[in-house]
Structures are given as structure tokens and as C-alpha cells.
């Protein structure tokens, strides 16, 4: 809607000689704004640039901006900032804890892998008329697991691609497999996805090896 209303097109062009912020310690001053309904987190490296943007919004009058401090939560994701290294990390532990409580699995045992290599979802019998209650519960759990997989636990992506094939014809057995993935999440919910600063000294990639589990 903002694009249709010409909001961004009406922003004034800053002359070249006025684009340098003396207070900015970086070669290029940057302001990144993620627009999502009324939650618009900003990431910037120059306070003057942010203040100029706030002045523009106030002058324009159509959008109000309010500072609420450092980003800690957004759309169910918890963020952490390391002021020393500049690294940013995130996790969804509170969401996983809530899911465990929702499905009565708070005290369940954990698993090292989200789905056993010997599991064969395709061999499970599919009823002609699936139980609507089971299908609804299954679809709800899988949808919640998908959101976690997309944002902070990408290693369960393949398992989710298997589970989503039965969204409208799931049985109790399928539901049990989905809860098995939740058991796995309980064991890894303290892990975080981290984006390191550009000058990180020890860049590496970590991967899961489940074949021998």
C-alpha cells in the first residue's frame, strides 16, 4: 500500500555533498528497514541517518515511528546481539517450550534425529475417510513446526517436506511421527542461528550427520 501511495517515491533526493555523516565511523552510512504491518525493525550504523529518517516521517505525517529499544522479539523469534563481535543470533526456544506444553510433551524424552532412518511414512495406510479431528491436530502441529524450520531450525526442512504430504489425510501414526520431530526440537532448542560480523576470525559451517545415528 505504501508503494501504491507513492510513499517511497516522494522521499527527497539528498545532494551528494550532504550524504556524508561526520558522526558515522563507517565508510557508508546504512539504514535497513524491514516493513511488516506495524512491526518495522531498523538496523543502522549511523544515528544521524536514523534521526534524519525520523524527521522525514514526522514531516510527512502519514506514518508515525516510535523507538522501542533494541530488537528482542519479532514474530515469535527471539534475537540476541553481541556488542563486542557484532554478531546477531536468534532462536525460538519459547515457542518450542509452548508447543511441548500444548501437546503434553513437556517431560518427554528427546531424540537425536527428527525422524528415524527406518521410518517409512509412505507405507502407512491411508483411510478412505480420515478422522477430521486427527487431521486438524496434525495440520496444526505441522504448520507450527514449519514456521520453526523456516526461521531457526533448517535441519528439519527435509523431514517437514515429508510430513506436509499428509496434511489432509493424516492418521494417528502420522501424528506420532510429527510429535517425534517435536522431541528432536526439545533437544536442540538451546541452539541459535548466528550471523557473524564480516571480520569474524573463525568462519565455519556446522552440519548434522544422522546416517549413523
Identify the residue ranges that each predicted region occupies.
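Generic low-polarity alpha-helical segments
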Residues: 2, 16, 42, 54-57, ...
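Intrinsically disordered, low-complexity segments enriched in polar/charged residues with Gly/Pro
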Residues: 2-5, 28, 66, 76, ...
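Polymerase palm active-site segment centered on the conserved acidic dipeptide of motif C
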Residues: 5-12, 41-103, 182, 186-194
